[in-house]
Amino acid sequence: MTTSTLTQSSDLISDTPRTSKIPMSQKVAFGIGMLANQMFPAALGIFMVILVESLGMSPLMWGLIFFLPKLVDALTDPLMGYISDRTESRWGKRRPFVFIGAVVAGLSYIAMWQLYEDNGITYNFWYFLGWSIVFFLGMTIFSVPYVAMGYEMSDDYHERTRLMAVAQWIGQWAWVIAPWGWVVLYDPEWFASATEGARTVSIYVGLICMLLAMVPAIFCDSEDTSSAEPKSGGKTLAQTFVELFKGIGITLKNKPFQRICTATFFIFNAYNCVAGFAFFIIVYYMNNGDPVAAGNWPALFG
């Protein structure tokens, strides 16, 4: 990496106030955002069972609904980071995107689950896939600047570590709370069908997570970058994209980064494989295909 590249990278991360000590109130505000960042995918994974169990979608459709939005997400994440790094506004370069992404993700999550059996499998597939892509675009707009915001809140390595520890502790509660959605959705005393439950519960999940995701945008400090020198340097859009992909190429050549990516790939795939099958194993192997008879077991294993 050249000296000029290092200088540009340093300039990009110097727009926000960097102090050694982060107040606990700021850590908690940032951590509440992490709860939303983890609750959205946690709740989505719980609700996704309904597509197969209640709406009759094939495993192929289910797989495509998982795969295609995440493919879009993988392509847009680095682009979002590039845009955020070069944003000048009175609210800083992260907070506007965190706020907008929270709104898009919350509202699209609600829309995504307004499914009806009468519409047919094909219609529900395309309807859900479309809104799912919008949802993951909203999550990209929210999560990429949000995570970057955390690394810019202090210039002290240990303080950033403490910030992330607080945030992760708060965020992990999403995976404790979300599995109970299975119990609520399939309890006949709550809803006549799981699909009806999803339509109703998604409204609460979407609105609550949207409000939680807004907290860092409102309460975490940032610096006015509206008068900052533009980072594009007068480059055209095409030149900007070329620079973006050159930067990605340089990053991918970094051996430690490759190891981290490889480990992350296997860890997340292992976890998601087990998590994806847990509900079906408990319902079909232990309870003869009756989700009502499964009771609290899916939540306890989740």
Named regions from a protein language model:
Residues 2-302:
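Membrane-embedded alpha-helical bundles of multi-pass transporters/translocases
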